[in-house]
């Protein structure tokens, strides 16, 4: 389920980023990617 930003899925993109990036985001805080 790791697609190179193929289909324009904003909702899914956010969910995906909140998964693997959740740890980094929590560590940095300012990183809102």
From Swiss-Prot:
<keyword id="KW-0027">Amidation</keyword>
<dbReference type="GO" id="GO:0007186">
    <property type="term" value="P:G protein-coupled receptor signaling pathway"/>
</dbReference>
<keyword id="KW-0765">Sulfation</keyword>
<dbReference type="GO" id="GO:0032094">
    <property type="term" value="P:response to food"/>
</dbReference>
<feature type="region of interest" description="Disordered">
    <location>
        <begin position="1"/>
        <end position="21"/>
    </location>
</feature>
<dbReference type="GO" id="GO:0005179">
    <property type="term" value="F:hormone activity"/>
</dbReference>
<dbReference type="GO" id="GO:0005615">
    <property type="term" value="C:extracellular space"/>
</dbReference>
<keyword id="KW-0964">Secreted</keyword>
<feature type="modified residue" description="Sulfotyrosine">
    <location>
        <position position="28"/>
    </location>
</feature>
<keyword id="KW-0873">Pyrrolidone carboxylic acid</keyword>
<keyword id="KW-0372">Hormone</keyword>
<comment type="similarity">
    <text>Belongs to the gastrin/cholecystokinin family.</text>
</comment>
<comment type="function">
    <text>Gastrin stimulates the stomach mucosa to produce and secrete hydrochloric acid and the pancreas to secrete its digestive enzymes. It also stimulates smooth muscle contraction and increases blood circulation and water secretion in the stomach and intestine.</text>
</comment>
<keyword id="KW-0165">Cleavage on pair of basic residues</keyword>
<feature type="modified residue" description="Pyrrolidone carboxylic acid">
    <location>
        <position position="18"/>
    </location>
</feature>
<protein>
    <recommendedName>
        <fullName>Gastrin</fullName>
    </recommendedName>
</protein>
<dbReference type="InterPro" id="IPR039236">
    <property type="entry name" value="GAST"/>
</dbReference>
<dbReference type="InterPro" id="IPR013152">
    <property type="entry name" value="Gastrin/cholecystokinin_CS"/>
</dbReference>
<feature type="modified residue" description="Phenylalanine amide">
    <location>
        <position position="33"/>
    </location>
</feature>
């Amino acid at each position: 389920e790791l697609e190179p930003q193929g289909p324009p899925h904003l909702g899914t993109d956010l969910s995906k980023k909140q998964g693997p990036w959740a740890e980094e985001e929590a560590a940095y805080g300012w990183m809102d990617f």
